[in-house]
Amino acid sequence: LMCNEEVISFAEALLEAARPGTQLAHCYTSPSGALANENGLKICMQHRCGAPRLLAFDHNFMGRTIVTSQIGDIPGGRQGIPLSTQVDYLPFFEEQDPEGSLQRTMDLLERYLWRYPHQHSCIVIEPVQGEGGFVAAEAAWLRVVGERCREAGIPVWFDEVQSFGRTERMYR
């Protein structure tokens, strides 16, 4: 199902489109966004062995599997599901107050890094929150958050499944 000529051609075309200005060398195709996110989480957790927590943003949507429902900040999606994934939520970009929202995000991020040193397997970022109200974070805001996480050794994972194509250009 996942390994045929069409999928290979698609993956090669996607990498070619993504490569300018990036370090992308691999592509994984998935039949759904939730399964893509599950695999992304698995890769991050394997990369950061022993880091049981992850960082995500308020009002994010990850998918409808058991794990992605726990990460997503959609309360109804977690009803009746035992919580086994440790998620620390950060405030997302606010268009009406970019600088203030960045300060609030960075303050809480620093608190989590202090409180749970070396315990975050990744930070999951939707550059354009779909379920959260179609809120598009500014590139500069994303850059500051991502750079701080990279400084702390935390992989930065962009979940661009639902909002793909809503940015001005590919992988902006």
Where are the model-predicted features located?
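Conserved PLP phosphate-binding loop immediately N-terminal to the Schiff-base lysine helix
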Residues: 126-139, 154-172
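Loop/turn-to-beta-strand initiation segments
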Residues: 120, 153-154
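Surface-exposed amphipathic alpha-helices with a cationic face
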Residues: 15, 142-150
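Short, cationic motifs built from Arg/Lys/His that form the positively charged side of catalytic pockets
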Residues: 45, 146, 167-168
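A glycine-/small-polar-enriched, mobile loop at the entrance of the PLP active site in fold-type I
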Residues: 1-8, 129
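PLP-dependent aspartate aminotransferase-fold enzymes
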Residues: 11-122
